[in-house]
């Protein structure tokens, strides 16, 4: 079924991909992504593992109502989370040669 050394070569490639995936998972967990809302008046910085590092709120919003500010913070966080997901997909595609993960399977595993 496999040519000479085919199975061994396949196993070696699988091991190399696994090592690259592990390195990518570490890289993604340590990266920081900024999400924005309100035309940049609220910025949320999160890690690739979705831990919030910073929340920056423009001074002009401190006088506005609390509910609007809460909505802007939530929107900025959601924007940052979306950016993390997009970055993960791009980096994964670079490693897997564009091979898509099965539906429902996400990085990191």
From Swiss-Prot:
The keyword Cytoplasm applies. It holds the Pfam family YbaB_DNA_bd. It comes from the Bacteria. It is found in: Cytoplasm, Nucleoid. Gene3D superfamilies: Nucleoid-associated protein YbaB-like domain. Binds to DNA and alters its conformation. May be involved in regulation of gene expression, nucleoid organization and DNA protection. This is Nucleoid-associated protein VV2410. It comes from Vibrio vulnificus (strain YJ016).
């Amino acid at each position: 079924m496999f040519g000479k050394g085919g199975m061994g070569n396949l196993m070696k490639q699988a091991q190399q991909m696994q090592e690259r995936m592990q390195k990518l998972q570490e890289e993604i967990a340590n990266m920081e992504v900024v999400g924005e809302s309100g035309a940049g008046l609220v910025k949320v910085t999160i890690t690739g593992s979705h831990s919030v590092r910073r929340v920056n709120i423009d001074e002009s919003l401190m006088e506005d109502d609390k509910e609007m500010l809460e909505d802007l913070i939530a929107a900025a966080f959601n924007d940052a989370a979306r950016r993390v997901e997009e970055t993960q997909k791009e980096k994964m595609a670079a490693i897997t040669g564009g091979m898509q993960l099965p539906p429902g399977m996400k990085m990191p595993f």
